[in-house]
Amino acid sequence: MSLFPSLPLLLLSVVAASYSETVTCEDAQKTCPAVIACSSPGINGFPGKDGRDGTKGEKGEPGQGLRGLQGPPGKLGPPGNPGPSGSPGPKGQKGDPGKSPDCDSSLAASERKALQTEMARIKKWLTFSLGKQVGNKFFLTNGEIMTFEKVKALCVKFQASVATPRDAAENRAIRNLIKEEAFLGITDEKTEGQFVDLTGNRLTYTNWNEGEPNNAGSDEDCVLLLKNGQWNDIPCSSSHLAVCEFPI
């Protein structure tokens, strides 16, 4: 068999294949002009601008890692407004009566008796050493010399009053107590010539010295107990012995 008859057939096959590749390239470049031949791809251009943010996605599922430690407590916030008052609770049951042992009352009575005995002993000691007692009055002096206003303040400080004899026995007790002339709780400061006690009551007992009261110098509004037990009016600004009386 001769090889030459098949040579045309081979050439025809090569031409057909080349035509097929040309058609394929042209089909891919339909927008290119017919005069421009197909070629290899060009170099990539610069990146374009970022696009706008998309919409927020849904919350994802919790991660699978371990949970972190709890953070430190935050600062205390401002106090809130007081809440409304609650409803009253139910009334409680009546309690059992208290117990008071007999020994408590007897002990209190014995303590009172002991205190009274001690007070009586102190009064007797004071009467013997510093003062004089007549009836329900106790007269006491600290031996100080002062003005009438200071005598009043001193006696008030000890819840007492300036000594004021209501009868001869009390006047004698004060006289026996003092070694110096002493103020009495009697004045006529409000009404001249009308002597009253410090509560404003008129006197029911007096023991004026002869010629007294005479208001010599026009300012003798206080009363002085002399060493002989009689009275004399003197200025309240003068200084004399302080004597106080205590009710007992």
From Swiss-Prot:
This is Mannose-binding protein C. Residues 43-111 are annotated as: Disordered. Disulfide bonds join 155-244, 222-236. The modification 4-hydroxyproline is found at residues 47, 73, 79, 82, 88. Residues 75-87 have a biased composition (Pro residues). Keywords: Calcium, Coiled coil, Collagen, Complement activation lectin pathway, Complement pathway, Disulfide bond, Hydroxylation, Immunity, Innate immunity, Lectin, Mannose-binding, Repeat, Secreted, Signal. Calcium-dependent lectin involved in innate immune defense. Binds mannose, fucose and N-acetylglucosamine on different microorganisms and activates the lectin complement pathway. Binds to late apoptotic cells, as well as to apoptotic blebs and to necrotic cells, but not to early apoptotic cells, facilitating their uptake by macrophages. InterPro entries: C-type_lectin-like, C-type_lectin-like/link_sf, C-type_lectin_CS, Ca-dependent_lectin, Collagen, Collectin_CTLD, CTDL_fold. The keyword Disulfide bond applies. It comes from Pongo pygmaeus (Bornean orangutan).
